[in-house]
Amino acid sequence: MGRGTWSWIVPDGLWEIAKPLIPPSRVRPQGGGTQDTPDETLFAAIIYVLVSGCAWRQLPPCFGISKSTAHRRFLIWSRAGVWGRLHEAVLHRLDDAGLIDVTRVVLDTAHVRAKKGGEHTGPSPVDRGKPGSKMHVLSDANGLPLLVGVSAGNTHDSEGLKPMVEGHQTRHDPHRGRYFKPQRLHADKAYDRADLRKWLRGKRIGVRIARKGIESSERLGRRRWVIERTMSWLSGYRRLSPRYERDPRNYLAFLGLAAALCC
């Protein structure tokens, strides 16, 4: 398979969205050197690592690039914020097509084992105290991931509610003529705190959080099932679960790319 033919790994249209976001490669002032690998090839290789979970050194020969080149470019693009902006650009496309529904948003968290430790890891209460992280996801009513985040495995789920809601409201461009405040927020009993309910109401967001020992999870689950599907999508990317990245910025970069792919 020739260079630049990556339809088997890159979804239709995604490269066209990503291409304007890629920072230009640095030009050697002295000239010379080997020819740069096409950005589209590097983009496909990074997606392959995310999907397969392989180490950089295990990239297939069909990409025609070294592990150091692929990893270095991933780090450069990650520090430039490419993956978060790609996710946001995909969301804008969907919103323009009327495919995002924020009448209801759904929040959930998943535990992820952290193989190598690092920042934003901690003893997991559901994995015998082994190092882990939590993946936080806010989706629209259809399960499209609107915002993703990561925290230590011993952080309570409820601690992620405020930053996720605030992050969703502030990251979208207000000049697009759309107000992104959700009308209602659905979450499970892990988020059942009086102060969070009061905070949401103060923002004029309807609260549909299951109450501990009172409300049936089955009834509220009619709205929350979409986030379970989204979590399943994200967990299917093998570079995310388990977590191999010691640097949380790298893990969040892969998570942002996965969110864009899920959309």
Label each residue range with its predicted role.
Residues 1-263:
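Short alpha-helical elements
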